[in-house]
Each structure stands twice: as structure tokens, then as C-alpha cells.
Amino acid sequence: METVQSAHEYIEHHLTFLTAGDGWFGINLDSMIMVWLTGLVFILSFRYAVTKGTKGVPGRFQCLIEIIFEFVDDIVKEIFQAKDKLIGPLALTIFVWVLLMNAVDLLPIDLIPALTSAVGVEHFRDLPSADINITMSMALGVFILVLGYTFKNKGVKGFIKELTTQPFSHPLLYPVNLVLELVTLISKPISLGLRLFGNMYAGEMIFILIALMPWWMQWALSVPWALFHILIVVLQAFIFMVLTVVYLGMAVEEH
């Protein structure tokens, strides 16, 4: 019974946020701190690559940055057909930022909580992409961008026409079209945020459960899972970035 209780307390400790405020007005400070830290790492690393880059033979870090840049640029050019100066930098920012947030999950599960406990902070969840508030906020930001691009390129009348005249062309079915299209429109940011949250939360839980096992089982299970989780970390950042570009491409696409 004592073992079960201690396991329960361990899991509860790792799943409790450092929160300021209550209810709807509460803010998960740990998630916000990690979001800003990973964002700072992104900015400083790319700034370093640009300012310290050599015109001759580039270093390893510069090569890595160039590979990421070209990778994202090729995807954007393939998906987003219109000309827009914002989409490329936006896609690069989303991919690298989400990748860095996800990569925090590859750190030892007790490392950052132990460091924060040493300075008197009892609870600190270090994986921001396992916080549904963070993932849904990012998805909401994408949704607002999609609406902005839609109104900019199609206008209010074009947007309403798009919602009411497809998939059925008969005027009597316009109300049905409106309901179907609104459901589709709203489901995009919801699925975008929940997909990232669900995958990263599940990965975090598996690491926590592995940490509860005997030390010899931890090594046998944590290394294979960490190697597999690298794929999940990269894949989820890639999916979030690609879907963002796809949705923005649909917003400027003429039907």
C-alpha cells in the first residue's frame, strides 16, 4: 500500500503545475517559463548562426541551421503556392520552436524538477507542449491567422460564400453547408492543438512510469523509448508546421 501511495504521489508531483491564480484566470508559470526559454534558445541560436557564419566552409552548427532552413523552405514552396513573405519565417519559427519545446521531454524526468526544488519551487512541469493551454493557444493563434488571410484574400462575402455554397450547390442546402463548413473550420485548430498535446502528454507519462521501475529496468526501457521518442518529438513539430502552412494555403486558395 505504501508503494502504491508513493507511486501515486510521484506521478501527482510530476503532473502538478506551478500555477499563479485560480480557475480560468490561472496561469501555469512553469509552462510559460519553458516556452520563453525555448523561444530564447531558438532566437539566440539562429542569430549566432547568422552573425558567426562563414562564407567559406561552414561549421557544423551552421550546416545544421542551413539544412533546417532549406528543409522548411522546400516544404513551404511545395504547399503554399501564393507569394507571401510571412509564411516562410512563420513555418521555420513554428517548426523549430515546437521542436525545442518537445525536446525538453528527452531530458531526465527528474532533472529540472530537482533543480527547481533546490531553490524552493515544489512543483515544476518542464514540458510545455504537454500543457493543453499552450498547445491550444498556439492552435488558436494559427486559427486567427487563417481567418485573417481568408478575409484579406477573399473578403467577408467570399468567406460567407465559401461556407454556404459547398459541398452542395443547391440553395436549399446552404444551411446544411454552413453547419458542415463551420464544424470543419472549428475542428482544425482543436485537432491541431489536441494532437500535439496528446502525443507529448503520453510520452511524458511513459517516462514517468519508467522512472517508477527498478533501476535495472529503467535503463532497459528508457533508452529504447527515448530513441523512439526522438521520432515523435520531430514528427509532431513537423505535423504542426505542415498543417499550419496547409491551412494558410487553403485560406488564400481560390475555389
From Swiss-Prot:
Pfam families: ATP-synt_A (PF00119)
Membrane-spanning residues: 24-44, 86-106, 131-151, 205-225, 226-246
Location of the protein in the cell: Cell inner membrane
Mode of membrane association: Multi-pass membrane protein
CDD domains tied to this protein: ATP-synt_Fo_a_6
Domain of life: Bacteria
Gene Ontology MF terms: proton-transporting ATP synthase activity, rotational mechanism
Keywords carried by this UniProt record: ATP synthesis, Cell inner membrane, Cell membrane, CF(0), Hydrogen ion transport, Ion transport, Membrane, Transmembrane, Transmembrane helix, Transport
Keyword Ion transport appears in the UniProt entry: yes
GO cellular component, one term: plasma membrane
Predominant place of localization: membrane
Protein's UniProt keywords contain Transcription: no
Family in the record: Belongs to the ATPase A chain family.
Function, in words: Key component of the proton channel; it plays a direct role in the translocation of protons across the membrane.
Subunit: F-type ATPases have 2 components, CF(1) - the catalytic core - and CF(0) - the membrane proton channel. CF(1) has five subunits: alpha(3), beta(3), gamma(1), delta(1), epsilon(1). CF(0) has three main subunits: a(1), b(2) and c(9-12). The alpha and beta chains form an alternating ring which encloses part of the gamma chain. CF(1) is attached to CF(0) by a central stalk formed by the gamma and epsilon chains, while a peripheral stalk is formed by the delta and b chains.
Name of the featured protein: ATP synthase subunit a 2
Species the sequence originates in: Vibrio campbellii (strain ATCC BAA-1116)
Organism lineage string: Bacteria, Pseudomonadati, Pseudomonadota, Gammaproteobacteria, Vibrionales
Gene: atpB2
